[in-house]
């Protein structure tokens, strides 16, 4: 890497350059895909660029250089990483352990990909609550032979002392822009781990500044890029747009540490992605709010530097206003009922309503992103109102629920997936959608890029349309253009091999710019007080659609709502021949001054009339932002009572509507499920609940059922030694009881294997029930098991109680007592109806901390005490075990020979 004139700028070359020049280079033998298959790679055919990536990673490992795999989102960084593990274990006999840190939202995806691509590598998912993780820690300490440990950033920080105890061969950090701050707790904590090789995965290796880039470099190679030299790095490369020599040097510097490929270069077969911006008008209500927000704090415009926080707050409030005025408290009219007013109050939702109707009729499926979870709430109400099927993921949704939502969207014909850009834009694979809509834009364009990549990625077989909704003549225009300009600069430098952004602008300039941004478009926006929501021809803008696919590659027309062609490659503030880059237009400035003068006049008038000026920002539009300054009339007790009554009636009505909607949704889901079962010729073996049994069974047959068992000995538990899969029964039917989880995956060993030897039905029926979503906690599957062998008299049946939960991370819960009790109630009804005996293993045997005493009481309460002959089996593993079992039994627990 020797470069002519390396020290010409600033004298002595920085330490990181000198150290890099002296680094040795090791060579790794080239890896072929057949080698990886021989070592255990399954379920995937690596593309040529992915195989190149694996070889590059192997080379970095041999050089002992940590590195950054910065491929564009959707190109398969996960499979390349797993292939590296297979290479290390297969060729180098390096069996780890390997540590993977990732966001909670993709934890299950990593687990599934490990099982799919590398089933020969054992993978432990380190997740759960404090108690569950404590149990995992004990297991890992006693049996630490695993290849991969998978966990989240948050759990890593909580249990850092435990995870530090392992000598990690490889540390993988997914979505590694979390490490862009050298001073962050995660950066500092991971720097203390014992790691041979660090690998960072990020589709956005450069987001904002040189400092963030250096933070990633110092993490993967702290010896080369010391934290103290970040200033030297920034100073040396801050003007690379102007200095080609500096850019070339930085390119060479980064080559050993950063590999980035983009879809346009390596995935040419990937269907096309087209981006369209559609502009919308504003409702009269939105315009009123827009004015009021601007006038709420005039002081912020008079001293920009000192009032930066206030200006940012004004910008945030204006963006909320452009989204929907109902985001402000007290605006939505009472009683709170969903109706057309939702779309009439917002120009954005008015356009979205037309857009979704167009997409729904065309058979498209949509990812709908917003910055604000409150906006997602409004969109969710809208989806219910229009009857569109949807899933939702935002920052409040737990990992297990996220995985289920993603799975449902992939497997069922759900129309819309509602996502928050930050929480839903990372790591998810949602290629079932072919349309992405941004309700609002992120300040950081990389976040929107990641979000769009949920649909446009490897595995997508349809063209993808990305649609961005922008409020015309509002702050949204400037936010979007700033982001577009920033992204254009980033792409120019990264894809050119330069990998970085220029220096940050001075803070004062940014503040001045913000104060001007807020005035943009006022002349046109406030030219009238009425609504500017227009009807547009969506097909002419979006292009032709056929059979649920976008088929037109023509550029969208610039009519109606789109301005893409007008903008071209102009400056980000240059529209229609006017340059807004340094200051707003004369017309915008004049409109703002008129608003200010009007506000001051109203304030003076209010002062003269003796009104309180505490809420001076609300004078322009009373009651709109912080409440009215107008003195309220005191209501009489009767009027107060009447108002309270109306509010209670409205609340009760809304609750009824919600309950009715919930009931209808449950009925629709049940009906859909029944139709699905019927189409698959599936018949459920689930027992009904105690409440659903007919009264004649509960009452009329009770005497005859219980008179048969009047002997006191018959109402106590009987303990026997033997194999529960071959019940010691007389001529009556026998119900064999076994507890399973709700995953639908049949277990191995113990009673699972014994039942398979007895009958082929248990595995087949249980796994089919799992596929048909017929397993729920407290449920019981009951079916005969006499297909291989049977008694001369009486029938043997197996009752599988779903008493355990296995989450999406493959973590199995203990036996849930409530589910067990519910299952025992159902078994009682079945045994009573059949006049059968019940035969159970010692449930929870050898499970640490299991409450056998409580379980025994439940069995006695719901079975034996209610007249059902009930047997508990001790399985004799050896003669000594049988003798020990017999000697330790009390008189109340006599073994039945």
From Swiss-Prot:
Adopts an inactive conformation in absence of DNA damage. Binding to poly-ADP-ribosylated histones activates the ATP-dependent chromatin remodeler activity. Residues 638-675 form a coiled coil. Residues 58-223 form the Helicase ATP-binding domain. The keyword Coiled coil applies. Changing residue 398 to E: Reduces interaction of the macro domain with the N-terminal ATPase module. Residues 642-654 have a biased composition (Basic and acidic residues). Residues 601-635 are annotated as: Regulatory linker segment (RLS). Its EC number is 3.6.4.-. SUPFAM superfamilies: Macro domain-like, P-loop containing nucleoside triphosphate hydrolases. The modification Omega-N-methylarginine is found at residue 9. The modification Phosphoserine is found at residues 540, 607, 618, 628, 636, 891. Residues 690-711 have a biased composition (Acidic residues). Residues 628-654, 687-711 are annotated as: Disordered. Changing residue 611 to E: Reduced interaction with histones. GO terms for biological process: chromatin remodeling; DNA damage response; DNA repair. Residues 351-513 form the Helicase C-terminal domain. Changing residue 77 to R: Abolishes ATPase activity. ATP binds at residues 71-78. The keyword Repressor does not apply. It is found in: Nucleus; Chromosome. GO terms for cellular component: nucleoplasm; nucleus; site of DNA damage; site of double-strand break. The macro domain mediates non-covalent poly(ADP-ribose)-binding and recruitment to DNA damage sites. Mediates auto-inhibition of ATPase activity by interacting with the N-terminal ATPase module, encompassing the helicase ATP-binding domain and helicase C-terminal domain. Binding to poly-ADP-ribosylated histones upon DNA damage releases the auto-inhibition by the macro domain and trigger ATPase activity. Does not bind monomeric ADP-ribose and mono-ADP-ribose fails to release the auto-inhibition of the ATPase module by the macro domain. ATP-dependent chromatin remodeler that mediates chromatin-remodeling following DNA damage. Recruited to DNA damage sites through interaction with poly-ADP-ribose: specifically recognizes and binds histones that are poly-ADP-ribosylated on serine residues in response to DNA damage. Poly-ADP-ribose-binding activates the ATP-dependent chromatin remodeler activity, thereby regulating chromatin during DNA repair. Catalyzes nucleosome sliding away from DNA breaks in an ATP-dependent manner. Chromatin remodeling activity promotes PARP2 removal from chromatin. This is Chromodomain-helicase-DNA-binding protein 1-like. It comes from Homo sapiens. The lineage of its organism: Eukaryota, Metazoa, Chordata, Craniata, Vertebrata. The gene is CHD1L.
